[in-house]
Design a protein with these regions (language model features):
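Charged, low-complexity intrinsically disordered terminal segments
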Residues: 1-234
Length: 234
């Protein structure tokens, strides 16, 4: 019961994402590895502020390394002043520890528990090819509408609560009436890793898909950094 729209570029995602954000009625959850000030984020932030004025709950979580180059130090405080619940995940420290490698690489947007975006596209101008860093940047994503969105709502809340002393209940965000899409085909399940878990969920999913493929295997990624295990499976 989930409709999937393939977003073949950052430019495609950008326009659709803004349109869906403007439809939000109850809550908006954003969890991104990279948020960078610029045309893209300024446009998104403008909509978020508009939604705050309408009474929509908005939360923004970004990886702590953004404060080293992408965002001002303490940027989450500015967002809080705007009425947005915000926090950096694993803030960067002036001293090195092994926990500095515990990064939040997710790119998740959930709207009202009914619409979700995920994929490899961050909220920065280079991902939409508004500015150029390494030539034309090719990355992809998907928009989901239907039952599978609950998985992404839960993934966000679980990561949000990692640093919370008082763990809130999830029911009011998960018990959402989701209409069945007319074009839903196949089976969709959201999944995710986190820096604190010992099980490599993402790697296991990829290896299973590779090892059980019988007709074709298509892989698209702007990064190709694979280990010996995956190379052997391929």
């Amino acid at each position: 019961n989930t409709d999937v729209t393939y977003l073949e570029s950052g430019e495609k995602k950008y326009g659709i994402l803004l349109d869906e954000l403007k439809k939000a009625k109850k809550f908006i959850f954003l969890e991104y590895f990279i948020i960078e000030q610029g045309e893209v984020w300024d446009s998104v932030l403008e909509v978020l502020c508009e939604k705050i004025r309408e009474g929509v709950e908005v939360r923004v979580m970004y990886d702590g390394l953004c404060s080293l180059s992408k965002l001002p130090i303490g940027y989450f405080k500015k967002l809080r002043e705007l009425g947005i619940k915000s926090k950096p995940f694993a803030p960067a420290r002036p001293f090195f520890t092994t926990q500095q490698n515990n990064r939040d690489h997710r790119k998740i947007l959930v709207i009202d528990g009914k619409v979700a975006f995920t994929g490899g596209i961050n909220l920065a101008d280079e991902y939409m090819n508004i500015v150029e860093r390494f030539g034309y940047w090719k990355d992809t994503g998907v928009m989901l509408k239907g039952d599978a969105v609950r998985s992404f709502t839960l993934l966000f809340l679980q990561m949000w609560n990692v640093t919370e002393k008082n763990i809130e209940g999830y029911s009011r965000y998960l018990n959402v009436a989701i209409p069945t899409p007319e074009t839903a085909e196949g089976y969709v399940m959201g999944y995710g890793d986190d820096p604190y878990g010992k099980e490599r969920v993402g790697e296991s999913v990829y290896l299973h898909m590779i090892n059980t493929s019988t007709k074709y295997l298509h892989i698209v990624s702007p990064y190709l950094v694979i280990d010996n295990v995956m190379m052997s499976s391929l």
